[in-house]
Each structure stands twice: as C-alpha cells, then as structure tokens.
Amino acid sequence: MFLMKPVCVLLVTCVLHRSHAWSVNNFLMTGPKAYLVYSSSVAAGAQSGIEECKYQFAWDRWNCPERALQLSSHGGLRSANRETAFVHAISSAGVMYTLTRNCSLGDFDNCGCDDSRNGQLGGQGWLWGGCSDNVGFGEAISKQFVDALETGQDARAAMNLHNNEAGRKAVKGTMKRTCKCHGVSGSCTTQTCWLQLPEFREVGAHLKEKYHAALKVDLLQGAGNSAAGRGAIADTFRSISTRELVHLEDSPDYCLENKTLGLLGTEGRECLRRGRALGRWERRSCRRLCGDCGLAVEERRAETVSSCNCKFHWCCAVRCEQCRRRVTKYFCSRAERPPRGAAHKPGKNS
C-alpha cells in the first residue's frame, strides 16, 4: 500500500495551438518534491495514451482528434459520451503502464520488482518467483496524478473517475504470466512464474472492446446538487463493474462537421481498400467513412520516393538508391448521391 499526499495536476490548453488540447507539455504539476521524480514517466505515459488512442481509432469516424484529448471535463470542449470514456481510460492506463515499467527497470530508487508472493504456491506445479512487474506501485502513483484532475462531485466527475479506474484495471487484467522450468535435464518438475506487462497495444485493444460495450448511465437531471443527489450518483456507479466503461450521453453524428463540438466530419478523410496486411475493419473503412456518410470515394494517384536497395560499404556506411513508386490512395469527397448501402445512424462511430 502506498499512502501519499494528493498532488495537484492541471491539464491546460496549449497556447500556440488551441485545438491541441492535450499534450505531454500540458502537465503542470505542483506538490511535494518527491513527486518530481515521476513527472517524466507520467508525461511519457500520457503520450503513449495519445498514440494508442489514435492507432485504435485511425479508421473510425471519430479518430481521436486533438480537441478530444483534454482531460478536464469542465473546459467546455468535452462531452460525456463513450469516446470521452475511452480517452480517460486509455490515458489512465498509459500513465500506470509507464510508471510500472519504469519501476521494474530501476528508474526509481524507492521501487523495484514485486516479490511479495515469491515462494508461495501459485497453482499445480508452479510457484511464484522471479521479478514480477510492480503494478501495485504503478497503480498507486498513477491514481494520485490522474484522479487529482477530478475535483467535482457531480455525475461527470464520477463518470471520469470510473473510467480512469477501468483503464487501470485493463493494465492489471492483461498482464501475462511467464514461467521458467526447473528439473533434471529439462524435465520441468516445477515452474517458477512471475507476471509481466503485455505490449501496450494489447491494453489498447482490450479497452477498444470495452468501448464498443460501454454502458450508458441514466441519471436524473441535476443529480449531484445535493447530498441526496450525490449519494444517488455514488450508488449508481458503485453498482457497475469498474472493468466496464460508462458514459452519460449519446455520441453525435461524426459523419458531419460540427464546429461547436470541434468535429471535422469525414469529408477529406483517407480510407483503405487494398493491402495484404489489412484487417476486416480497415478494408471496410471506405464504406464506413465515405459511403455510409453520403460521400463518394475519390481515387488519387501519387508518387512516393523512398530508400531502397541499401548496401553496406566497408567501413562504415550504408548507401541506398532512391526508388519512385506510383501508389493509389482513396479519400472521402462530397458527391450529390444517396449513401451507399444502409443510411448511417447519427451517433455511431462504426
């Protein structure tokens, strides 16, 4: 158990680019000097959350735009929909993940492997041992930083805190058990096992699944303005598993531009049609972003230049040729025609 005084953490809108509402430079931290050692890890974790959000939603109608990445729920730019839920969860997970990893790497003097269960029986034929990643440490420190952003007691704050916790649960729930065999001539009579962090991509994929299954919480208008209202909010969220994402509002129509909400719509977005490595979701992106939004798919030819036929020359240089290649790209463009297939439904991001 790590008991610490709360830290004040503020996320502010970038002065130079107001649309870039959340970047690692937006973290302004004050508090005990002891916390300063964690600041670079917190910033790196926040950055990993940004990158993972953009990866997971690259071919969705909502593609994790910068304006969506402001963690403060009172800045006027944020809704309480399922996309907001994902942003909170993935950012919380990113901070916890990075703190845990850096702890195991020995970056902090007061933290190392979690050996609290070493020597104990873990299951049939194996014992706890080795160097487990210290998720308890990462969880405690990240909670002090990320949850400090929520100072309100209304439904929005409760939603954000719930999704922060869901992000931390995702890190713990995707940890991998790694084992080493012991015995004569590799007989593996017994095994010593420890827990390791997965690739952060696995955490992101797990939370993307939770995003699709997010639960909408219906509360009475104005709940939270009284002690009874705050109690009702607490009871409602307490009844929902902290492994699930929750939201209060339906999502807007991401096909359309909405300047008030900072949404650009899908016109002009690139989509994918061909490629050996494309998954089903990527291959359907032109239909999802263009056709179902009432837009045509415009084919554009372009020439790319890249290094190729690289050779190592003794000693010590690598020389490459410049190869030109014609490629075809696809974009959503305005067209006077009805949507292809079934009409899109407002609020859907798929």
Curated annotation (Swiss-Prot):
Primary localization class, coarse: secreted
Signal sequence segment: 1-21
Domain of life of the native organism: Eukaryota
Record-linked Pfam families: wnt
Record carries keyword Repeat: no
Alphabetic keyword roster: Developmental protein, Disulfide bond, Extracellular matrix, Glycoprotein, Lipoprotein, Secreted, Signal, Wnt signaling pathway
One MF annotation (Gene Ontology) recorded for this entry: signaling receptor binding
Keyword Disulfide bond: yes
Gene3D superfamilies in the cross-refs: 3.30.2460.20
GO cellular component: extracellular region
Sites of O-palmitoleoyl serine lipidation: 185
Residues of this chain annotated as glycosylated in UniProt: 102, 258
One record GO biological process: negative regulation of gene expression
Subcellular location field: Secreted, Extracellular space, Extracellular matrix
Disulphide bridges, residue numbers: 53-64, 103-111, 113-131, 179-193, 181-188, 255-293, 271-286, 290-332, 308-323, 310-320, 315-316
Post-translational modification summary for this protein: Palmitoleoylation is required for efficient binding to frizzled receptors. Depalmitoleoylation leads to Wnt signaling pathway inhibition. Proteolytic processing by TIKI1 and TIKI2 promotes oxidation and formation of large disulfide-bond oligomers, leading to inactivation of WNT8B.
Family statement drawn from the similarity comment of this UniProt entry: Belongs to the Wnt family.
Role of this protein: Ligand for members of the frizzled family of seven transmembrane receptors. May play an important role in the development and differentiation of certain forebrain structures, notably the hippocampus.
Protein name, UniProt field: Protein Wnt-8b
Species of provenance: Mus musculus
